[in-house]
Amino acid sequence: MLRKGICRLIHQVSESSKKPYFLTTPIFYVNAAPHLGHLYSLVLTDAIARFQNLKPDVSVISSTGTDEHGLKVQTVAQTEGVSPLQLCDRNSKRFADLAVAANTKFTHFIRTTNPKHQASVQEFWKTIQKAGMISFERHEGWYCVSDETFYPESAIQKVVDPATKQEKRVSMETGKEVQWSSEMNYHFLLSKFQSRLIEHYNKNPNFVQPSIFHTQVLEELKTGISDLSISRPKQRLSWGIPVPGNSQQTIYVWLDALINYISVIGYPWLNEKSSLSAGWPANMHVIGKDIIRFHCIYWPAFLMAAGLPLPEKILVHSHWTMNKVKMSKSLGNVVDPFWLIEKYGVDTIRYYLLKRGRLTSDSNFDIEELEKDEEHDLRRSLGVLLSRLQSKKLFISNEIQKQWHKKDDFTEYEDIVHELIELPVVCAQSIDGGCVYEVINLVQSVLRRVTKLFQLKEPWKLSDDSQEKIDTLMLVAHSLRISGILLQPIMPTKSTELLDQLGIPKNQRSLQNATNVFEPTEFTFHSGNNSHLFDKRTQ
């Protein structure tokens, strides 16, 4: 019987462990205001963290924050006539406010201007210097101010500036202009880690996901990597953390920034046991595709040099565009994330971004598409189904519900029941790969099928003691219950409202509860509190 199939369901839950599940967003650069891409990184990471929280005996640590040093911050502050710290204080608050507005539940918010972080960075420097992985020598190369990095000759190209008609050199990766620079810097001996990095990538095929990015990094490693400049002369860059033992040099902003992932949980640790209890190694870093090299080559090499374990997984996502063009203030196609949340509501925006956002390809922001998703997926599919279930004509007593839960023959509804059985497991697999959009598509598939069943059976026309009516309503109720549980990481507020209206106790909303398709539940039918889950939008 299908009941046996339910019992054999593999629960994808983590065993109780002393090590918390730790995942991170990139920390955001404070030279400009938050944009849609920042919001997507926040809600994607938060949704994955919330899904982990649905598992029993799992402690979750999640961090976000702001990257506040470097030449760009120093330059913008000078332009605005404020101190770098004043600029950082103002803009860091905007990112913290966005995290709150997006209803994210990060346990840590880090700022790289925090003295504890700066102490961690200097300790890390001393560790890799003691390991013999830092040299001091003249560095010459093509430097990009906006990217704050040196590029090798092979990574630049000549182009003609359309405005000036003059030839210039730009980064092939970012398109930003580069200039020749020659100065004394500290260097990290990155080239010494080429073979170790390649070996790690070969042994851990899921280290960078999706696989297209794993392959991309591996190919870059095979072509060879050069030693990396990790400091700048103080006379050129004063806004940053001084190199230990040489106050005339400032630590490279990317080395500083990457260390946030360990400083936020207390690095340096006393021993391996204390690092594990703090959360390291991280289970997942979530990053945008524009910072792959820093996270997938530099960061693992830095950790190897310091004798620290590497993160379990680096999840890469693509960008958001408008009209298929990268968002830019000069083009007037920038969307204010605060305005979006204010106008459409946080759960609708979270749902839209997580449904439409992709990992391997850029996603195009479209207001009409957003409103279509809100109308069809949320109001008509989820909202209307809940509203219909709570009609006065469709009441089922608790006694009848208790008798129904003893039933073990669902042959007539076999396809839907099988889909419900598989739903939590497949959703867990999708979350593990960072594909939150697949969770939404899977849930919507179930809701569409159940809606068709509801329309086909027309339970409002059947007598109260009709077994067909009871079966239909209980199947719809459990489908909404399971959908509500699985949508909690995506739409925390609306999912809570849905489960509240169904009468699901707070302690019965875990992944384990979702895996039991017909878990004995006393649903609230026609409670009198069945307000519309999604009100009709007024223009």
UniProtKB/Swiss-Prot annotation:
Localization of this protein: Mitochondrion matrix
GO BP of this protein: methionyl-tRNA aminoacylation; mitochondrial translation
InterPro entries on file: Met-tRNA_synth, Met-tRNA_synth_2, Methionyl/Leucyl_tRNA_Synth, MetRS_core, Rossmann-like_a/b/a_fold, tRNAsynth_Ia_anticodon-bd
Domain of life (superkingdom): Eukaryota
EC numbers for this chain: 6.1.1.10
Amino acids binding ATP: K329
Chain positions of motif 'KMSKS' region: 326-330
CDD domains (alphabetical): MetRS_core
The entry's keywords: Aminoacyl-tRNA synthetase, ATP-binding, Ligase, Mitochondrion, Nucleotide-binding, Protein biosynthesis, Transit peptide
Motif ('HIGH' region): 28-38
GO cellular component: mitochondrial matrix; mitochondrion
Catalysed reactions listed for this entry: tRNA(Met) + L-methionine + ATP = L-methionyl-tRNA(Met) + AMP + diphosphate
Record-stated family: Belongs to the class-I aminoacyl-tRNA synthetase family.
Protein name: Probable methionine--tRNA ligase, mitochondrial
